[in-house]
A protein has these predicted regions:
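Extended, subdomain-level signal for the structured scaffold at the beginning of enzyme domains
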Residues: 1-120, 132-236
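Short, thiol/selenol-centered motifs that function as redox-active sites or metal-ligating centers
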Residues: 126-131
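Active-site cofactor/cluster-binding pocket
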Residues: 123
């Protein structure tokens, strides 16, 4: 799991971490340069029923929960991406948050790791703004996402949120559109897909080796698909 040092979304990391740990997996945490990650403060706000839609966080999923404390301890011991051995991991998961658009998504070092994992047929996953990371990786001169069904945080929702003050100022202007980057690389992202993603906070798409989700509430579903994929051979 690669966390942003500019601003990752808490539940997008927590939800997947919780599912992986429940499934008996070890989870290795990294940042691009080994610096401490920074959580987007809006993702830690207690918002009551709104947390069901991915706005803020519930008490059960907070850093103060038992699993939250475990994750916080793991974050204290994270390592730089240069320490990641692609041959030693079973899958890659990327939590989003607007901050990842500034450091994780365009990291050439991470692109190299992804390229090796892709060559070896390992599952590649992510949610929200992190999904466009895969748009910048090529194999044999072609984007690895070309022709693949993807989802992530819709650009039109970003536009609405930015204009209504729902995005932290430090993330503005948003450096690029998550879904536009994917579309430019040839990923399949129809308006129907974008609408479904906007209406269903748990929306996920599977097109191996990729497993992607709309946002915070999709993190658990993405992790479950990855866990299932290791029990069965997924289709080419």
């Amino acid at each position: 799991m690669i966390l942003s040092t500019v601003g990752y979304h808490w539940e997008e990391a927590f939800g997947a971490y919780d599912e992986f740990r429940n499934g008996g997996w070890d989870v290795a945490l990294f940042t691009v340069d080994g610096s401490p990650p920074k959580v987007d403060p809006t993702s830690l706000k207690r918002t009551g029923p709104l947390s069901w839609f991915g706005f803020g966080v519930s008490k059960a999923n907070s850093p103060e929960s038992p699993r939250g404390r475990e994750l916080m301890a793991a974050i204290e011991g994270l390592r730089p991406l240069s320490d990641l051995d692609p041959s030693a991991i079973d899958a890659l998961y990327l939590p989003g948050g607007h901050g990842c658009l500034f450091d994780v998504n365009r990291s050439e070092a991470l692109h190299g790791v992804i390229g090796e994992l892709h060559r070896n047929g390992k599952p590649l996953s992510g949610v929200c703004h992190a999904t466009s990371t895969y748009a910048f990786v090529e194999a044999d001169g072609r984007p690895i996402v070309a022709g693949k069904r993807f989802t992530g945080f819709p650009g039109f929702v970003d536009t609405i949120m930015s204009s209504t003050g729902l995005v932290q100022r430090e993330f503005l202007p948003i450096p690029f559109s998550n879904d536009q980057a994917l579309a430019d690389a040839g990923a399949k992202l129809s308006w129907r897909n974008k609408l479904l993603a906007a209406l269903n906070p748990r929306y996920t798409r599977v097109d191996w080796p990729f497993v992607t989700g709309m946002g915070p509430k999709a993190a658990r579903g993405v992790a479950r698909e990855i866990i299932r994929s290791q029990r069965h051979t997924y289709p080419e």
